Amino acid sequence: MRNEHLAKLTKEELMDLIEIYSKNWLAHDGVWFQSIERKHGMDEAVFHVEEAWKRFTVIEAMRIKEFLHLPENPGLEGLEQALHYRFYGNLNKHECIREGNKLIYRNRDCRVQTARSRKGLPYHPCKSVGIYEYTGFAATIDKRIKCRCLSCYPDCNESPDGCAWEFFIEDSIQNQIQEAKLVQEGLADLVENKTNDGPTVIKNIRENFGL
């Protein structure tokens, strides 16, 4: 179903409307959470938001993946693309940084935490929720991708007003470790043999690792 009224809007108006829709979604997420929090406490509210995010993050990732026409396993490049199109991508100041074979995603200014702080409410202990959210999203984009929390309340290494997550493909990291060990062994063999077998060792290292 398409809303014919949307077709009449300019690009700028559509961008404004997307921001409004995103804020509305986040407002709904917040009001039902606070309703449970007031009646049953923080632990009960966190339980229900975890259950919701387990399902929602997969749905969101699947639709974004289809929209971007990503292949089955698009790697960290595909994940980086998809992260920018999440609802939160329209709400929070965020950045993606590539560090070798890892992708760092950092929320600089989380609307949820800043709003709670502004209202005098305690910070939302969202690390457990974030683990389901980001792990599930990444695995839906590419089943090989793993996720590790770098900073998220209450386990913050950075500002509690944001969070940071590291994504990586486990096989590639294990392969790098194995390759590093093999190179180390080859260099050790080179030193041990000195000039006697040096050219052969160098040749083998170059052939094995494409140097």
Which role fits each region the language model picked out?
Residues M1-I104, D109-V129, G136-A164, E170-L211:
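N-terminal accessory segment detector
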